[in-house]
Amino acid sequence: MDDIVNVYNYHNDLSQVLVYADSVIAGLENKGRQGTAANYRSARRAFEMFLDGSPFSFEELTPEVLDRFVTFLRERGNRPNTVSFYLRQWRAIYNRACADHVVFSDQKPFRRLNLKEEVTSKRAISREKIAQIECVDLTACHADMQLARDLFLFSFYTRGMSFVDMCYLNKENLQGNYLRYKRQKTGQELQIRIEKDLRVLIDRYASPLSDYLLPMLRNGDRYQDYRRRQRRLNKLIRELGDRLQLDMPLTFYVARHKWEYHKNSTINI
């Protein structure tokens, strides 16, 4: 009987990091914020593996523990940006716990960690490779291959717009010669001037039957449908990179990091 009570108490003790993370994830899912919930769930899973079944409270979360967590992740082959991703999710969860008065400590365990994502030259492909992607003839390929290529270019032309933000663009975001939208992840408002190449893509996918600018979502789509399409388009953009014999895997992140890497160049983009 005592064991049952202890298990019940554990699963209702929000001072336990995994229990609190579960409550945050459930709340996000109820609000329809499936992407953030998925990110937190991934970070939670990694930390649960690190704990190896041991209970762990927020009071025990110190810089030294986080250092061990980083070592644990690296020893399992996680790349620096993956490690940084997990730490950023846990910092966000920790900050929520502070705001909810679950954590009362002022030790700031994340203060000395470098949580910035690296922009690597490996991802920042040359402008000549971008031109190859722009000019490749895909008329004999499935229409989804052209869509994957066009989404890659759309991201590049819009200064690295994320996949999820492209998905949710609608006609109200078109305001004259500008594209104005809020980032799904942060709510930050952005404005992008619509130049010729971007206008071509917008016009190509314009449809009176959809409120969206690009054909990834339909009205009423579930998050799972969005993720399934994202996986397919990710697969196709990698296949396009192989087709062009690029010296690196082609992903939508490449378009985003290409912009970051070259944003101070003199190339007219």
What is the meaning of each model-derived region?
Residues M1-R45:
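N-terminal DNA-binding module of tyrosine recombinases/phage integrases
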Residues D22-G35, R44-S121, V136-T139:
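N-terminal core-binding DNA-recognition domain of tyrosine recombinases/integrases
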Residues L73, F154-S155, L169, H262-T266:
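Short alpha-helical segment immediately N-terminal to, or the first helix within
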Residues N95-F104, S155-G176:
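Short, charged phosphate-coordinating catalytic segments
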Residues F110-F163:
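Basic, Lys/Arg- and aromatic-enriched nucleic-acid-binding interface segment
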Residues I130, E195-D247:
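Active-site/catalytic core of tyrosine-dependent DNA strand-transfer enzymes
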Residues A140-A143, N234-I269:
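Short, basic (Lys/Arg/His-rich) helix/loop patches that form interaction surfaces
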Residues Y168-R204:
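Conserved tyrosine-mediated DNA breakage-rejoining catalytic core shared by Y-recombinases
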